[in-house]
Swiss-Prot record:
Cofactor binding notes: Can also use manganese, calcium, nickel and cobalt ions in the ligation reaction.
Active site: 273 (n6-amp-lysine intermediate)
Native species: Homo sapiens
Protein name: DNA ligase 4
Quaternary structure and interacting proteins, as annotated: Interacts with XRCC4; the LIG4-XRCC4 subcomplex has a 1:2 stoichiometry and XRCC4 is required for LIG4 stability. Component of the core long-range non-homologous end joining (NHEJ) complex (also named DNA-PK complex) composed of PRKDC, LIG4, XRCC4, XRCC6/Ku70, XRCC5/Ku86 and NHEJ1/XLF. Additional component of the NHEJ complex includes PAXX. Following autophosphorylation, PRKDC dissociates from DNA, leading to formation of the short-range NHEJ complex, composed of LIG4, XRCC4, XRCC6/Ku70, XRCC5/Ku86 and NHEJ1/XLF. Interacts with DCLRE1C; the interaction is direct. Interacts with APLF.
EC top class, as a word: ligase
UniProt EC number: 6.5.1.1
Tissue-specificity statement: Testis, thymus, prostate and heart.
Domain (BRCT): residue spans on this chain: 654-743, 808-911
Catalysed reactions, semicolon-separated: ATP + (deoxyribonucleotide)n-3'-hydroxyl + 5'-phospho-(deoxyribonucleotide)m = (deoxyribonucleotide)n+m + AMP + diphosphate
General function of this protein: DNA ligase involved in DNA non-homologous end joining (NHEJ); required for double-strand break (DSB) repair and V(D)J recombination. Catalyzes the NHEJ ligation step of the broken DNA during DSB repair by resealing the DNA breaks after the gap filling is completed. Joins single-strand breaks in a double-stranded polydeoxynucleotide in an ATP-dependent reaction. LIG4 is mechanistically flexible: it can ligate nicks as well as compatible DNA overhangs alone, while in the presence of XRCC4, it can ligate ends with 2-nucleotides (nt) microhomology and 1-nt gaps.
Residues binding ATP: 271-274, 278, 331, 345, 367, 427, 432, 449, 451
Region feature (Required for catalytic activity): 610-620
Alphabetic keyword roster: ATP-binding, Cell cycle, Cell division, Disease variant, DNA damage, DNA recombination, DNA repair, Ligase, Magnesium, Metal-binding, Nucleotide-binding, Nucleus, Repeat, SCID
Taxon lineage: Eukaryota, Metazoa, Chordata, Craniata, Vertebrata
Length: 911
């Protein structure tokens, strides 16, 4: 019965294509009602099929879960991470589809966030992949929902095992058996962003009235789908249960001015706001489980029993003898026993992955209790829960502690507590109503939080320069969604800064309108960032932008952040925690941004915390903060960088008209002919000089490929020519036609012309070649290293494995190197026994992919023995001298494998 149930599921019958077409209709529908109708139709048909399939069975576990986990992939908890993002998917598609790396489609996938002006899909990788895949895929796929889930399970488990080869194999199966439309939705499921235009709350409400509430207290999608399969049957008691993760209660941001009103003019509790990881602990005797605020299981890290983990062994004996079962809510902190202090989360450690030999130890700071000995406490008041909490365990400093609280009545007490938190470099404070009950996944139902950055004027703000950008995704597609900001190296007195160190990436704080306007302002200045040739004026750490902007064309933004924390991702060696843009400093010039010295001073001021000011009560009893003086604005000095100045050609005498009305842009010259000399000579021959190439520029002259030249090459709008061509023109006093040897880069039209005139090595089809030109052509021809048959065999094997052709019978021996016992004396070729069956076997082995050798040496994988076993002992003696041990098999292994079209188990044929 159990076997039949597992094989007979709705998911194993419903085509994945049906789910995708439903999702497509939901996405394309305009109104909410129409979106709901399409989802309800799919859900109803599933339930009807379920009833028909299982009409003779009771207590079946089959449910809507296989489809729901694909519709709401962001709520998936059973499946581990895929380890796949858009860029990795792009590279896999390019490899699996064998797309030319520099081809149009490959570049579309790799640069999916870059606006192209077509389709309007910038930032939507799934849509871009759809258009690339459409001409290459099936019209309709053959996979069921169950098969898709199985393959996704395989990808997740192989990612955990770091088996990239098996991940590729599963992805290849998905690609070859699904249509472009199905893959579009599959990509969105893997990335966990379906863009349906309908919330998870709406999906839950259509599925069942109790679904959202049950998910809040269990975070278990499968349990929701199983328990609420019948929409007519509700749950009488939806409450927190042991060993089932729930979404914790959250705090809303408080307005200090209204704090007494929010607390209903009654007394309230003030607690320290801890800067750790929110974690719930479930305990039943010696069994423990730990869950994060999003329902992820961290039991392996903290310990499932008193004998394992970074926490459980140290706190198990702290619980009172009469406490068998409990559920606690608190913050997991890192504690330094040497300094007896808690570490802030911004420093370089991860409490969820701390190793045993760390100088820090895990400490659980508990502030709530939800169950004790099977008694549920969620509906008890906070005051009552606090009383119970104090009787559950004996605190152990640095291991398990109760978060201390103070009782308060007034706004002034809140301000004093906040100022004290600022002095102690703490994150902030919590304010809680004593009569509040615990409401999972609810924010602000009696719990409030106050952090210095929420209060105007308490934070030191940073004026930093935008130096890079990142294209947006989703609703921000086609515009810059994040910016890379930097501080300046302090320049010599009287000069402007020329080098900038990256500090932080920032994207929040801006409205869509502000983001759009800022992007529009900087749009014409963005340039592609090339990792191998970065701009010399912008120094980066490991974090690199997608595009950059010359500092002199950029703007300063005022940033507010919680603190400055260490980071090797940025050149400054630190970054900002929780940065957000406050405003654009239109009143400041680009060179007036913060310097490295300013940053170091601010960093040392309050241990990196950017809140160092106190909140004060003014005369009108309203919170006030001290105003800071605005920095005096420096007078603008307008000038042109020296190397961009136009040359002074007033004293040049014209000697020829060969370049009359021809515009040149000279980027650089040679050692013997520097840039000014070339410009003077061009003017002598009647040409015009510009410092930046435009639509009328005939060509760009470059003696070396600096950053400006590389950017011109990337634009693909201008021909870039060596100074040697100019010198040839000057020497002959004629307009010498271009030849391949003169060219650094050709724009498309020139490239097309050259393709008609020259072969790929630069040899003209029509003009006679002299000896020197022929030598030059030959020097440009690289030797093609022909591969040996052995190397080709290895290459073929890799290709067969990559594209799953290795299951073909014709390649079954491809990775085998075989020696056949055809010689009376091993390795003596003159003693070959002619006309034996083994000679035929050698041909069959080669036909089916094997490499057959006549010399027994290191690297042989198999030795095949015929009827004569007299040399077996000699072969075994040989084998003992080899690093890699070969297998000695009967010839029937070859015969049986070929007859049955697959490799047979070798152990049955061993000699």
């Amino acid at each position: 019965m159990a076997a039949s149930q597992t094989s007979q599921t709705v998911a194993s019958h419903v085509p994945f294509a049906d789910l995708c077409s439903t999702l497509e209709r939901i996405q394309k529908s305009k109104g909410r009602a129409e979106k709901i109708r399409h989802f309800r139709e799919f859900l109803d048909s599933w339930r009807k099929f379920h009833d028909a399939l299982h009409k003779n069975h009771k207590d079946v576990t089959d449910s809507f879960y296989p489809a729901m986990r694909l519709i709401l992939p962001q709520l998936e908890r059973e499946r581990m991470a895929y380890g796949i993002k858009e860029t990795m998917l792009a590279k896999l598609y390019i490899e699996l589809l064998n797309l030319p790396r520099d081809g149009k489609d490959a570049l579309k996938l790799l640069n999916y966030r870059t606006p192209t002006g077509t389709h309007g899909d910038a930032g939507d990788f799934a849509m871009i992949a759809y258009f690339v895949l459409k001409p290459r895929c099936l019209q309709k796929g053959s996979l069921t929902i169950q098969q898709v889930n199985d393959l996704l399970d395989s990808i997740a488990s192989n990612n955990s095992a770091k088996r990239k080869d098996l991940i590729k194999k599963s992805l290849l199966q998905l690609i070859t058996q699904s249509s472009a439309l199905e893959q579009k939705w599959l990509i969105r499921m893997i990335i966990k962003d379906l863009k349906l235009g309908v919330s998870q709350q709406t999906i839950f409400s259509v599925f069942h009235n109790d679904a959202a509430e049950l998910h809040n207290v269990t975070t278990d999608l499968e349990k929701v789908c199983r328990q609420l399969h019948d929409p007519s049957v509700g749950l009488s008691d939806i409450s927190i249960t042991l060993f089932s993760a729930f979404k914790p209660m959250l705090a809303a941001i408080a307005d200090i001015e209204h704090i007494e009103k929010d607390m209903k003019h009654q007394s309230f509790y003030i607690e320290t706001k801890l800067d750790g990881e929110r974690m719930q602990m479930h305990k039943d005797g010696d069994v423990y489980k730990y869950f994060s605020r999003n329902g992820y299981n961290y039991t392996d890290q903290f310990g499932a029993s008193p004998t394992e983990g970074s926490l459980t062994p140290f706190i198990h004996n702290a619980f009172k003898a009469d406490i068998q079962i409990c559920i606690l809510d608190g913050e997991m902190m890192a504690y330094n026993p040497n300094t007896q202090t808690f570490m802030q989360k911004g420093t370089k450690f991860d409490i969820k992955r701390m190793v045993e030999d760390s100088d820090l130890q895990t400490c659980y700071c508990v502030f709530d209790v939800l169950m004790v000995n099977n008694k549920k406490l969620g509906h008890e008041t906070l005051r009552k829960r606090y009383e119970i909490l104090s009787s559950i365990f004996t605190p152990i400093p640095g291991r398990i502690e109760i978060v201390q609280k103070t009782q308060a009545h007034t706004k002034n007490e809140v301000i004093d507590a906040l100022n004290e938190a600022i002095d102690k470099r703490e994150e902030g404070i919590m304010v809680k109503q004593p009569l509040s009950i615990y409401k999972p996944d609810k924010r602000g139902e009696g719990w409030l939080k106050i952090k210095p950055e929420y209060v105007s004027g308490l934070m030191d703000e940073l004026d930093i320069l935008i130096v890079g950008g990142y294209w947006g995704k989703g609703s921000r597609g086609g515009m810059m969604s994040h910016f890379l900001c930097a501080v300046a190296e302090k320049p010599p007195p009287g000069e402007k800064p020329s080098v900038f160190h990256t500090l932080s990436r920032v994207g929040s704080g801006c409205t869509m309108k502000e983001l759009y306007d800022l992007g529009l302002k900087l749009a014409k200045y963005w340039k592609p960032f090339h990792r191998k040739a970065p701009p010399s004026s912008i120094l980066c750490g490991t974090e690199k932008p997608e595009v950059y902007i010359e500092p002199c064309n950029s703007v300063i933004v005022q940033i507010k952040a919680a603190e400055i924390v260490p980071s090797d991702m940025y050149k400054t060696g630190c970054t900002l925690r929780f940065p957000r843009i406050e405003k654009i400093r239109d009143d400041k010039e680009w060179h007036e941004c913060m310097t490295l010295d300013d940053l170091e001073q601010l960093r040392g001021k309050a241990s990196g915390k950017l809140a160092s000011k106190h909140l004060y009560i003014g005369g009108d009893d309203e919170p006030q903060e001290k105003k800071r003086k605005a920095a005096p604005k420096m007078k603008k000095v307008i000038g042109i960088i020296e190397h961009l100045k136009a040359p002074n050609l007033t004293n040049v005498n014209k000697i020829s008209n060969i370049f009359e009305d021809v515009e040149f842009c000279v980027m650089s010259g040679t050692d013997s002919q520097p840039k000014p000399d070339l410009e003077n000579r061009i003017a002598e021959f009647g040409g015009y000089i510009v410092q930046n190439p435009g639509p009328d520029t005939y060509c760009v002259i470059a003696g070396s490929e600096n950053i400006r030249v590389k950017n011109i090459i990337l634009s693909n709008k201008h021909d870039v020519v060596k100074p040697a061509w100019l010198l040839e023109c000057f020497k002959t006093k004629s307009f010498v036609p271009w030849q391949p040897r003169f060219m650094i880069h050709m724009c498309p039209s020139t490239k097309e012309h050259f393709a008609r005139e020259y072969d790929c090595y630069g040899d003209s089809y029509f003009i006679d070649t002299d000896l020197n030109q022929l030598k030059e052509v030959f020097s440009g021809i690289k030797n093609s290293n022909e591969q040996t048959p052995e190397e080709m065999a290895s290459l073929i094997a890799d290709l067969e494995y990559r594209y799953s052709w290795d299951c073909s019978p014709l390649s079954m021996f491809r990775r085998h190197t075989v020696y056949l016992d055809s010689y009376a004396v091993i390795n003596d070729l003159s003693t070959k026994n002619e006309g034996t069956r083994l000679a035929i076997k050698a041909l069959e082995l080669r036909f089916h992919g094997a490499k057959v050798v006549s010399c027994l040496a290191e690297g042989v994988s198999h030795v095949i023995i015929g009827e004569d076993h007299s040399r077996v002992a000699d072969f075994k003696a040989f084998r003992r001298t080899f690093k890699r041990k070969f297998k000695i098999l009967k010839e029937s292994w070859v015969t049986d494998s070929i007859d049955k079209c697959e490799l047979q188990e070798e152990n049955q044929y061993l000699i």
